[in-house]
Amino acid sequence: MKLVLIRHGQSEWNKLNLFTGWHDVDLSQEGVVEAMTAGKRIKEAGLEFDVAFTSVLTRAIKTLNYVLEESDQMWVPVHKSWRLNERHYGALQGLNKQETAEKYGADQVQKWRRSYDTLPPLLEENDERQAKNDRRYQLLDTHAIPSGENLKVTLERVIPYWMDTIAPEIKEGRRVVIAAHGNSLRALVKFLEGISDDEIMDLEIPTGVPLVYELNDDLKPVNKYYLDK
């Protein structure tokens, strides 16, 4: 069984080196090219899908659309869930990463970005950036909407969705593609591969490059490779 993971193509805020999180930004032109290239490589590799999953953020949705279009699979059913969203960067969202490092120190910013269990500064309740002000989250219990997340909290929302919704599709023999985000995919990869809390700090997933897993019957990886050529 094969599972394909794709981090969205470069976004406008990736290009500007800004913390993005749940802020909804579009793909950059380079990101569009990355997504289209991913779709072409998937087609060349002969990978076919029966069902697709993505977040509710534009950059991931558009990446998936380009992938399916370029691989001639636009008809594949797509399921969107906030549980596949990027990690919520709290009050860091919208700030420049380099300027934040100069203000707080590179070590502190590295912990906010890469540590498994260090939370970023949280959004204030009345901050206009709160996700509760966004219509796509209005049906969620307000207690489920974060004001900031670390990777641990991100994993705690991603993995139940994997277990309850995605994994059963794979076990039924359906071929799955997931287009999501750097940290929601890091959380899933950590779970699939059994990566330790310390080792996960060093894992980087490139934008717009399909990551193919070959899974056994227990959905444990027996092989993985990037479609980067």
From Swiss-Prot:
<keyword id="KW-0324">Glycolysis</keyword>
<feature type="site" description="Transition state stabilizer">
    <location>
        <position position="181"/>
    </location>
</feature>
<keyword id="KW-0312">Gluconeogenesis</keyword>
<dbReference type="GO" id="GO:0006096">
    <property type="term" value="P:glycolytic process"/>
</dbReference>
<comment type="similarity">
    <text>Belongs to the phosphoglycerate mutase family. BPG-dependent PGAM subfamily.</text>
</comment>
<feature type="binding site">
    <location>
        <position position="59"/>
    </location>
    <ligand>
        <name>substrate</name>
    </ligand>
</feature>
<feature type="binding site">
    <location>
        <begin position="86"/>
        <end position="89"/>
    </location>
    <ligand>
        <name>substrate</name>
    </ligand>
</feature>
<dbReference type="InterPro" id="IPR001345">
    <property type="entry name" value="PG/BPGM_mutase_AS"/>
</dbReference>
<feature type="binding site">
    <location>
        <position position="97"/>
    </location>
    <ligand>
        <name>substrate</name>
    </ligand>
</feature>
<feature type="binding site">
    <location>
        <begin position="113"/>
        <end position="114"/>
    </location>
    <ligand>
        <name>substrate</name>
    </ligand>
</feature>
<dbReference type="Pfam" id="PF00300">
    <property type="entry name" value="His_Phos_1"/>
</dbReference>
<keyword id="KW-0413">Isomerase</keyword>
<feature type="binding site">
    <location>
        <begin position="7"/>
        <end position="14"/>
    </location>
    <ligand>
        <name>substrate</name>
    </ligand>
</feature>
<feature type="active site" description="Proton donor/acceptor">
    <location>
        <position position="86"/>
    </location>
</feature>
<comment type="function">
    <text>Catalyzes the interconversion of 2-phosphoglycerate and 3-phosphoglycerate.</text>
</comment>
<dbReference type="InterPro" id="IPR013078">
    <property type="entry name" value="His_Pase_superF_clade-1"/>
</dbReference>
<dbReference type="GO" id="GO:0006094">
    <property type="term" value="P:gluconeogenesis"/>
</dbReference>
<comment type="pathway">
    <text>Carbohydrate degradation; glycolysis; pyruvate from D-glyceraldehyde 3-phosphate: step 3/5.</text>
</comment>
<feature type="active site" description="Tele-phosphohistidine intermediate">
    <location>
        <position position="8"/>
    </location>
</feature>
<dbReference type="InterPro" id="IPR029033">
    <property type="entry name" value="His_PPase_superfam"/>
</dbReference>
<feature type="binding site">
    <location>
        <begin position="20"/>
        <end position="21"/>
    </location>
    <ligand>
        <name>substrate</name>
    </ligand>
</feature>
<dbReference type="GO" id="GO:0004619">
    <property type="term" value="F:phosphoglycerate mutase activity"/>
</dbReference>
<protein>
    <recommendedName>
        <fullName>2,3-bisphosphoglycerate-dependent phosphoglycerate mutase</fullName>
        <ecNumber>5.4.2.11</ecNumber>
    </recommendedName>
</protein>
<dbReference type="InterPro" id="IPR005952">
    <property type="entry name" value="Phosphogly_mut1"/>
</dbReference>
<feature type="binding site">
    <location>
        <begin position="182"/>
        <end position="183"/>
    </location>
    <ligand>
        <name>substrate</name>
    </ligand>
</feature>
